[in-house]
């Protein structure tokens, strides 16, 4: 056996997820009705901006048999009902973190009844009624971010001070200070908005056009580098998406993402970017948009809806979402993979069949792409360049 440690699995970048999603807090240390009420107050205040979810468990009296609802009692493993103003799924199967994260993939903020379930971060309520119960859950306090004092409580329990590093730096509010609690979560969510990376799609073979569209000089430099420079003011990092054989052509000014999902066109390029950095949002732009400018990108970023799976423009040509000038949020990664597993590799189909935010383009001509020599000549004329 080799001295080097054998690796059984690919070294994949994993998204920063908890048991249920990216941003989750377990509230524990007080009776369940108080946790439910607090969660309702937070959700009522923040649901206008964020998709919120609540996770709990039912209480069953000892010795009382579990009764399955509806058709589950007849042996069904699942039942779905369209409730007109909402949808209801009921399952008779075991769930673990993988299943929870799939069901709640759209959620931005998840509040968990920590008396029954665990979450990545915690809010600890100081309540004499649940002191003994809280002592038994010390191993669950892995990332305490807030203390809440119930009426009559004035200090943190001593056993918490011993168990939680730097406990004195954790904010402390009264459970009745609802505005402060809501502001705490609002600030946490604002800080959790994913950074934007830029991705220039330059890996196509340009079969219809006849030559590499990324190498056309529209603005004094090759188009793929021009677009990459346009993206820089709006992105933390900018990458050029390319095929393996194109790597040697890049001059080193920009990072690259080589397709690891091959033979899927732009769909594979987007997935390859998420595979590299799954917690980033990706501003994906095709390199065949010669009229694209800073104003269009600025409009897209300023109107970004980070709670959607993506923010895009409506195409002025066919009225459909334009997938190749789109901000794809991290939550879209799982959806893109899901569509692929069902036999679809069209990013536009994902946008059509999801909650994507679709904007009217401020300058419709900027979305004109060049796939043929006729479109090439039209673009040159619009740019005031010499035409043949």
Question: Could you describe each region identified by the protein language model?
Answer:
Residues 34, 60-66, 131-134, 152-160, ...:
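Short, charged/polar "capping" segments at the starts of alpha-helices
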Residues 14-24, 36-93, 98, 103:
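N-terminal phosphate/diphosphate-binding loop that engages ATP/GTP or pyrophosphate donors
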Residues 1-26, 173-191:
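Extreme N-terminal, non-catalytic leader segments
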Residues 4-8, 78-82, 149-150, 166-178, ...:
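Short acidic-hydrophobic, aromatic-tinged amphipathic segments that line or gate anion-handling sites
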Residues 162-195, 368-388:
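Charged phosphate-binding loop/patch that engages nucleotide di/tri-phosphates or the phosphate backbone
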Residues 33-35, 45, 58, 193-344, ...:
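Nucleotide and nucleotide-moiety/phosphate-recognizing core
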Residues 109-187:
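Phosphate/Mg2+-binding loops and adjacent switch elements
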Residues 22, 49-50, 76, 104-109, ...:
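Short, high-confidence coil segments that cap the C-terminus of an alpha-helix
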């Amino acid at each position: 056996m080799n001295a080097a440690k054998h690796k059984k699995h690919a070294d994949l970048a994993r998204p920063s997820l908890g048991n249920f999603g990216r941003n989750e807090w377990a509230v524990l240390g007080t009776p369940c009705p108080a946790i439910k009420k607090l969660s309702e107050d937070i959700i009522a205040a923040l649901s206008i901006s964020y998709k919120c979810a609540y996770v709990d468990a039912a209480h069953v009296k000892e010795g009382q048999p579990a009764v399955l609802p509806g058709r589950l009692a007849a042996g069904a493993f699942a039942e779905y009902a369209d409730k007109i103003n909402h949808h209801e799924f009921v399952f008779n199967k075991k769930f673990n973190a993988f299943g929870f994260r799939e069901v709640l993939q759209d959620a931005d903020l998840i509040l968990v009844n920590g008396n029954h379930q665990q979450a990545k971060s915690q809010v600890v309520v100081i309540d004499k009624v649940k002191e003994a119960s809280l002592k038994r859950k010390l191993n669950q306090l892995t990332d305490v971010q807030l203390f809440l004092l119930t009426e009559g409580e004035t200090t943190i329990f001593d056993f918490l001070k011993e168990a939680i590093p730097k406990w004195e730096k954790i904010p402390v509010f009264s459970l009745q200070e609802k505005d402060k609690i809501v502001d705490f979560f609002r600030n946490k969510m604002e800080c959790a908005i994913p950074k934007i990376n830029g991705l220039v799609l330059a890996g196509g073979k340009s079969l219809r056009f006849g030559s590499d569209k990324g190498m056309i000089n529209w603005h004094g430099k090759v188009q793929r580098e021009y677009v990459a420079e346009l993206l820089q003011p709006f992105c933390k990092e900018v990458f050029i998406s390319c095929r393996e054989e194109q790597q040697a052509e890049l001059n080193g000014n920009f990072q690259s993402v080589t397709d690891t999902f091959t033979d899927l066109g732009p769909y594979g390029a987007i997935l390859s970017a998420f595979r590299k950095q799954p917690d980033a949002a990706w501003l994906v732009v095709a390199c065949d948009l010669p009229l694209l400018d800073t104003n269009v990108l600025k409009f897209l970023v300023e109107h970004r809806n980070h709670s959607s799976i993506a923010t895009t423009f409506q195409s002025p040509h066919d009225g459909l979402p334009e997938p190749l000038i789109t901000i794809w949020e991290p939550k879209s990664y799982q959806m893109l993979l899901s569509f692929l597993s069902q036999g679809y590799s069209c990013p536009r189909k994902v946008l059509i069949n999801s909650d994507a935010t679709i904007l009217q383009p401020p300058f419709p001509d900027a979305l004109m792409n060049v796939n043929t020599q006729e479109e090439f000549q039209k673009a040159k004329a619009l740019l005031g360049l010499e035409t043949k």
